[in-house]
Amino acid sequence: MQPPSRRTLLSLGLFTLTACTVAACTTDRTGPAPGATGPRPDPDAPVRLRAVAATDALLTGYDTLPAPPGVDGAGLRAETARHRAALAEGLPATAVPSPPVTTGPTAGAPPTTAGPATAAAPTPATDGLAALELRTAESHLADLDAAGPSLARLLASLAAAHTLHAAALGAPAPPLAAPPTASASATPAATPGEAPGVGAAAVTALQNALGAEHAAVYGYGVVGARLPDDPARTDARTAYAAHQARRDTWQRLITSLGAAPAPAAGGYQLPFPVASAADATRLAAHLETRLTGVYADLVAAVPAPHRLTAALALRDCALRARRWGAPDQPFPGVPDPAATPAATTG
């Protein structure tokens, strides 16, 4: 058997894809208006203010309801405060209310378990906080279509983060989103970018997502082969089927836009040797974590009608990564805003 070609190695999006490829191709709707001497009002400001208000309600919930034993409520609240800061970035200080100050119980005992995550046992207080987290996630998803590309990407990431918080608080995971069929508005006779609102950058991002799903399907074949016949292998089969469905969805959508879907490579180079069940579990977590970045970029690249599909795919990958033992990320799929120097304006 010949070794994988250079094309094969480069096509392994999950293992070698750089997260900035699509982000660099998208632009927001801000900047000076023609003929104006200064920046025009940020059209994302109303969306940001709504998201900040929803986050403030959640912070107040953490100050009112105690976290259950074994859950780091203070840590979840601190992450939520970081979400608020990211959402308020760029808003005039006079337009943003002061954030809630911690006054009530949020601290539970820090988690002591390691390995694949398990949910806390539901309690009345847990249900209250978890419901607030899920409500905040839904509010962010509801505003995807009203946001500019970068803000939509952030909202999708935060919706996934709040769903992870709800899982940590004991809420059952939401049902996995069913991959939709290709939009009827795009016909097979169309050329790339000819369908309403779909340009070349969006088609490129869809091809990247398709390539990543090809790699995930291959990767889960390796995962399943290294796991014993137990619930973990059942989880791997379920994930394998989910990624096949996503792959098929992107193939249909790309075809409907008049482009040729990228084929799967003959083989893929794994990020590390997979010789045991522990290695297989680690690979599954790696696959899902890498996919969150792919789908965050897709949210920013596609037009509004397709953003929710990409955002739900991001959420599902984040939940599966957690199930496989990956640590929860404060900003799934996107760089931590606190680690990125803020741009200055003159």
Model-found features: residue ranges?
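All-alpha RGS (Regulator of G-protein Signaling) helical domain and cognate RGS-like helical scaffolds
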Residues: 2-346
